[in-house]
Curated annotation (Swiss-Prot):
Matches recorded under PROSITE patterns: RF_PROK_I (PS00745)
Protein name according to UniProt: Peptide chain release factor 1
Bilayer-crossing regions: none
GO annotation, cellular component aspect: cytoplasm
Family: Belongs to the prokaryotic/mitochondrial release factor family.
SUPFAM superfamilies listed in its UniProt record: Release factor
Keywords recorded for this protein, A-Z: Cytoplasm, Methylation, Protein biosynthesis
Organism whose genome encodes this protein: Granulibacter bethesdensis (strain ATCC BAA-1260 / CGDNIH1)
Highest taxon above the source species: Bacteria
Function: Peptide chain release factor 1 directs the termination of translation in response to the peptide chain termination codons UAG and UAA.
Length: 352
């Protein structure tokens, strides 16, 4: 279908939905039509703006033959010629296939990789950075796991981030994050390099993943704290093993075994859902390990250089000299640039 024909189809569909809603629909049909129309209306507004610009350009060009109107017509035509390509591009981007998971909430997982104690300290800082970003965006941030080192570091942490388009905004954060700085314990002033892995998984819904209880091995045990000492006299900690996939999820944050099991199942479903998505979309990692890499220092998506006060995203060659603001959760500059880069790449691929 040509671009022009596709625009006609979209506008016609929006008119059809408006007519159906005005005539009255019941229950699920009304809700479905309302959702579809809400998605189409911003695109239709841009299409109508494009058509108005095209009509205006045609009228201005027709006026060029009139000596009295030529100067005004040339000025108007120039403005509209400059406007048309950007409008067309905006519409093409809006019509790109959407990731079904973009509107969903997400599971965030952070683990120190290379660098020992310094990696653990930076993992804790990244966890706080994303928590602050969630606050800025108005999202709910619930800690599912926070295994601290006892020295301000983080052995591993997970959080459920709930809100609209959480996955769409955070999915580009998956990968290896590298930090370069002088540790507090470094007497010679040498810069150390450490890495932390970040994984962002779209939250699974019950319709996405069906888990057979017979495929699960569930172990319960007493929760332990820093240093390995038991902090709970009851067996409240839960470890769930999904036998077909080999995925293991352990949870001990809650004092209730029931709550720990519910959280562990939520994480398990998110990981199974991501595996399904990976199988369906060859461009994505085959599993979570591929998503975050090995944690080796040479594999990185972003570098945080504290001595220079800069943060560099290596995928889009964007460097910002405001590391303090970034660590306080001001990530939108990176997220917006990564989103634009992804849209441009998909648009180019579509036009080939």
């Amino acid at each position: 279908m040509s671009f022009t024909a596709n625009l006609d189809r979209i506008v016609a569909r929006a008119e059809e939905l408006r007519a159906s809603l005005s005539e009255g629909l019941n229950g699920d049909s009304f809700a479905a039509a309302s959702r579809e129309l809400a998605e189409l209306e911003p695109v239709v507004a841009r299409i109508e703006e494009l058509w108005a610009a095209e009509r205006g350009l045609a009228e201005a060009e027709a006026m060029l033959a009139d000596p009295d109107m030529r100067e005004l017509a040339e000025s108007e035509a120039e403005i509209l010629r400059e406007k048309l390509p950007s409008l067309t591009r905006e519409i093409r981007i809006a019509l790109l296939p959407k990731d079904e998971a973009d509107e969903r909430s997400a599971i965030l997982e952070i683990r120190p990789a290379a660098g020992g104690d310094e990696a653990s300290l930076f993992a804790a800082q990244l966890f706080s950075m994303y928590q602050r970003y969630a606050e800025i965006r108005g999202w709910r941030f619930e800690i599912l796991e926070y295994d601290d080192t006892g020295l301000g570091g983080l052995k591993g942490g997970m959080a459920e981030i709930t809100g609209r388009s959480v996955f769409a905004r955070l999915k580009y954060e998956s990968g290896v994050h590298r930090v370069q700085r002088v540790p507090a314990t470094e007497s010679q002033g040498r810069i150390h390099t450490s890495t932390v892995t970040v994984a962002v998984l779209p939250e699974a819904e019950d319709v996405d993943v069906q888990v057979d209880e017979g495929d699960l091995r569930i172990d319960v045990y007493r929760a332990s704290g820093a240093g390995g000492q038991h902090v709970n006299k009851t067996e409240s900690a839960v470890r769930i093993t999904h036998l077909p996939s080999g995925i293991v999820v352990a949870m001990q944050e809650e004092k209730s075994q029931h709550k720990n099991r519910a959280k562990a199942m939520k994480i398990l479903k998110a990981r199974l859902y991501e595996q399904q998505r990976a199988a369906l979309h060859a461009s994505r990692a085959a599993d979570r390990r591929a998503q975050v890499g090995t944690g080796d220092r040479s594999e990185r998506i972003r570098t945080y250089n504290f001595p220079q006060g800069r943060v560099s995203d290596h995928r889009i060659n964007l460097t910002l000299y405001k590391i303090d603001r970034v660590m306080l959760g001001e990530l939108d500059d990176f997220v917006d640039a990564l989103t634009a880069e992804d849209q441009a790449a998909r648009l180019s691929a579509q036009e080939l």
